[in-house]
């Protein structure tokens, strides 16, 4: 093939492979003119040059930062895992102890990163948290100690990380509303991560600590374009309970709960009580009912304790005179209400008396007043923290030492308010009025709506949230309850109430074996082998005695107006929850 023929063939191939020229259409759908095309081409070249320039500048900035001396090196970063290799003995400060009075002082503290905000590349704000105390801290770039690299790193610290911060306290010129320390802030000199976050948080602690009112208000404002707060439901919180327990509200709740236990123990120890520890597994159910957890105990059946009732009484028969216990109580009740759990903490006591069971009832009244006054005087700060999320009115204590009602007098108060109406067989009652009726108005136990109504009546009429109802009907009390000697339809028993909610049930116990067996049979409880040793304890002599059992979580719930009893338990148990 000649050279000319080759050139012709190549031209032919190029023609076949040549792509059609791009046709650019204008807004009118027609091809652009040459003038318009030229203008578009210039704009494209200009845009391309801009991108190339920005890329060069970014690369140059990166190189400058890499070559820039970090004069804060060693003042920030992740600390190695603490394996207790050294103990320098430095002095640490609590956030609660910091105020404007410390202006100019250097402090060292360990805290969690509650919130953070990077402002440009020269400033980072933190809210540092210890339990329910928070303080604002900031790292600001300067020429000598705080570098841009340090501030940038500060902005990368994950929320809930535990940090070691050293800084100077500065009096704030304005009130810092977002922190509990409102008149001072910390200007950071050094900051290290002690314990980083190694998984994504299921929710923010800040979100879990908001009140229902705050959430609703944000949802209403969202319609106007504002962002709304995240609603963290109770199940999500309980599924991730360790994180949830970090909220300031929960920290305050469980401080108060611990304070109640301490006050209970202090008062009883100062009145010659002995702390006891009874078995939580037994061969018989203490109440003689079916609401017990049955367990396999080697080759026989056992039960988880419903209460320490039987053992408290046996210890009284053993001359222990005054005993108390703080321990777990198990109830196999398939109830999913806001006020029931299958495991809770019981504050139980039992004591011998000399003449009348009212000696014990009066003592328990004084015990409760001591507990309530302890909360009011020593835990006012914690109560205020809880009220930010769960608003409540002050708990009203009676002007006198006690407010008591006979059961039939409480029934009378309810009748006057339109409750306790006789339910006639076959009578149709409106659904919204069902709780106004009962089969036996004089002797039926109070329903939950009736208890609440009575609480409101007593509050308005007697100006108290704390009161006692005495002489409950024998038919609604356990077999070991002493009948009223004057009217056996009633019993020597009592319930204590807070805001119309029962928090303690107690009574004089039967300490005569024959009467005890008689009552057991009358109520359908078999005095079998499982209860025989309990009965025998009274056959060898036992002083008259009375006592009661307090539900710890209920006291916390009702005092703080919590919407659900699960909020008063660190790791609640109910029919649907056995973890965590």
Curated annotation (Swiss-Prot):
Gene3D superfamilies: Bira Bifunctional Protein, Domain 2 (3.30.930.10), Nucleic acid-binding proteins (2.40.50.140). L-aspartate binds at residues 287, 331, 505, 509. Keywords: Aminoacyl-tRNA synthetase, ATP-binding, Cytoplasm, Ligase, Nucleotide-binding, Phosphoprotein, Protein biosynthesis. Pfam families: tRNA-synt_2, tRNA_anti-codon. It is found in: Cytoplasm. The keyword Transmembrane does not apply. Its main location: cytoplasm. Its EC number is 6.1.1.12. GO terms for biological process: aspartyl-tRNA aminoacylation; cytoplasmic translation. Residues 1-66 are annotated as: Disordered. The modification Phosphoserine is found at residues 282, 307. Signal peptide: none annotated. It catalyses: tRNA(Asp) + L-aspartate + ATP = L-aspartyl-tRNA(Asp) + AMP + diphosphate. One of its GO terms (cellular component) is aminoacyl-tRNA synthetase multienzyme complex. GO terms for molecular function: aspartate-tRNA ligase activity; ATP binding; RNA binding. SUPFAM superfamilies: Class II aaRS and biotin synthetases, Nucleic acid-binding proteins. It is an enzyme of class 6 (ligase). ATP binds at residues 331-333, 339-341, 502, 551-554. Residues 15-31, 38-66 have a biased composition (Basic and acidic residues). Homodimer. HAMAP family: Asp_tRNA_synth_type2. Belongs to the class-II aminoacyl-tRNA synthetase family. Type 2 subfamily. This is Aspartate--tRNA ligase, cytoplasmic.
């Amino acid at each position: 093939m000649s050279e000319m023929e080759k050139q012709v063939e190549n031209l032919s191939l190029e023609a076949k492979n040549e792509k059609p020229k791009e046709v650019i259409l204008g807004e009118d759908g027609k091809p652009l003119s040459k003038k318009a095309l030229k203008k578009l081409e210039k704009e494209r070249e200009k845009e391309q040059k801009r991108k190339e320039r920005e890329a060069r500048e970014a690369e140059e900035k990166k190189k400058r930062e890499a070559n820039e001396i970090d004069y804060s090196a060693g003042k920030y970063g992740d600390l190695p895992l603490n394996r207790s290799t050294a103990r320098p003995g430095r002095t640490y400060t609590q956030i609660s102890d910091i105020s404007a009075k410390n202006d100019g002082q250097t402090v060292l503290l360990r805290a969690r990163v509650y919130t953070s905000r990077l402002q440009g590349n020269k400033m980072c704000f933190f809210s540092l948290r210890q339990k329910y105390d928070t303080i604002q801290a900031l790292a600001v770039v300067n020429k000598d100690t705080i570098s841009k690299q340090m501030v940038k790193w500060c902005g990368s610290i994950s929320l809930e990380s535990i940090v070691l911060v050293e800084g100077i306290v500065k009096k704030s010129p304005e009130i810092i509303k977002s922190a509990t320390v409102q008149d001072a802030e910390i200007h950071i000199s050094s900051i290290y991560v002690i314990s980083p976050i190694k998984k994504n948080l299921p929710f923010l602690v800040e979100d879990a600590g908001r009140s229902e009112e705050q959430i609703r208000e944000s949802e209403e404002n969202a319609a106007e374009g504002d962002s709304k707060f995240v609603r963290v439901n109770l199940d999500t919180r309980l599924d991730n309970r360790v994180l949830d327990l970090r909220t300031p509200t929960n920290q305050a709740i469980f401080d108060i709960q611990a304070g109640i236990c301490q006050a209970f123990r202090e008062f009883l120890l100062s009145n010659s009580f002995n702390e006891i520890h009874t078995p939580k597994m037994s061969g018989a159910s203490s109440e003689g009912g079916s609401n017990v957890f049955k367990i396999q105990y080697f080759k026989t059946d056992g039960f988880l304790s419903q209460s320490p009732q039987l053992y408290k009484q046996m210890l009284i028969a053993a001359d222990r005179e005054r005993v108390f216990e703080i321990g777990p109580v198990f109830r196999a009740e398939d109830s999913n209400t806001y006020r029931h759990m299958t495991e809770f903490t019981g504050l139980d006591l039992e004591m011998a008396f000399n003449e009348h069971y009212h000696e014990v009832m009066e003592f328990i009244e004084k015990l409760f007043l001591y507990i309530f006054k302890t909360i009011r005087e020593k835990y006012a700060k914690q109560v205020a923290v809880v009220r930010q999320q769960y608003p409540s009115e002050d708990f009203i204590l009676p002007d006198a030492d006690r407010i008591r009602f006979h059961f039939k007098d409480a029934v009378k108060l309810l009748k006057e308010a339109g409750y306790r109406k006789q339910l006639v067989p076959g009578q149709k009652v409106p659904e919204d009025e069902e709780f106004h009726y009962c089969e036996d108005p004089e002797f039926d136990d109070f329903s939950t709506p009736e208890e609440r109504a009575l609480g409101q009546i007593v509050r308005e009429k007697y100006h108290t949230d704390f009161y006692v109802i005495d002489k409950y009907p024998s038919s609604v009390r356990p077999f070991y309850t002493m009948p009223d000697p004057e009217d056996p339809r009633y019993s020597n028993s009592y319930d204590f109430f807070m805001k119309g909610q029962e928090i303690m049930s107690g009574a004089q116990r039967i300490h005569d074996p024959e009467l005890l067996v008689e009552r057991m049979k009358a109520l359908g409880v078999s005095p079998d082998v499982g209860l025989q040793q309990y009965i025998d304890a009274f056959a060898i002599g036992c002083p008259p005695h009375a006592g009661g059992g307090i539900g710890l979580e209920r006291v916390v719930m009702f005092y703080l107006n919590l919407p659900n009893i699960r909020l008063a338990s660190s790791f609640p148990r109910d029919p649907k929850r056995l973890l965590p």
